[in-house]
Amino acid sequence: MMGVPAAMLRTFRAGEFDPTRLVTEKGGQKISVCLPARDEQDTVGPIVASIRAALMEAVPLVDEILVVDDHSSDDTAAVAARAGAKVLSADEILPEYGRGHGKGEALWKSLYASQGDLIVWCDADVRDFDPAFVIGLIGPLLARPDLVFVKGFYERPDDTGRDRGGRVTELVARPIISLLFPHLAAVVQPLAGEYAGRREALERQPFVEGYGVDLGLVIDVAARFGLDAMAQVDLGRRVHRNRPLDELSPQATAVLQTALWRADPDLIRASAVLVRPGLDPIEIEAVERPPLIGVPGYRRSSA
């Protein structure tokens, strides 16, 4: 696989899509914007309010904003509700499956609980959120019926003002993709939390529970539907909270774990302990939720 060149991936710019025209192209389809959130009381409100004002009230493009609160210890749920989102606790969605953990769990449950035929996911910690992110992600799906998954990418300035791809992306995701999944090397931001897809495709994918979900979905959608069914869109510039390195090591471990798991399940154990000098050890588990298409009571797509 080392000699396999990166495949081309259709690439768009958010600015090339007009929201009024997208309303016409949308037809009878419903669009849900879902935000997984944990302890994001400072940013989730403005994000929800901006989507609601621009894409529900000014232009009727989005039908639903759903925030799945992933065990927040602050006022994330209340702030999101006041801003106009439908808010559900992760624990109240599919409780018969037990309490999972992490971002992937929240995404999986948001897919179950939402009503849209097209799903847009955005991170809830973005400080300069622009509703154009949603327009850019949904635009290719409405313009090109052959696409099933659209990944966002952006300029991401670091604390020095220079644009970077993110530390975990540059130090872990990009190298492991180049080594094990070189056909995906054209994906600019493989760990970006902004992406969209058709329910009929997403409901057939397993969801890694934790931080590995972003990369896991890229790998799995490409394997099932092919790169011709995928695209990426330039969302411009995005600023979010920069976490200290000790908070990034669990994410880096989960991303590496997911990549190795997808390459060959026998390469890793189902559970690993991240040991860091001077800090408490953290267990990182390779756990995934099943495709929703097989979950009893799930609202299936019409496809």
Question: Residue spans of the language-model regions?
Answer:
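N-proximal low-complexity "stem/linker" segments adjacent to membrane-targeting elements
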Residues: 1-53
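Terminal low-complexity segments of carbohydrate-biosynthetic enzymes
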Residues: 1-6, 243-303
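Conserved donor nucleotide-binding strand/loop of the catalytic core
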Residues: 63, 77-105, 113
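A conserved acidic beta->alpha catalytic loop
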Residues: 69-78
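The conserved acidic donor/metal-binding loop of glycosyltransferases
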Residues: 123-129
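Conserved catalytic loops of nucleotide-sugar-dependent glycosyltransferases that act on lipid-linked
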Residues: 164-258
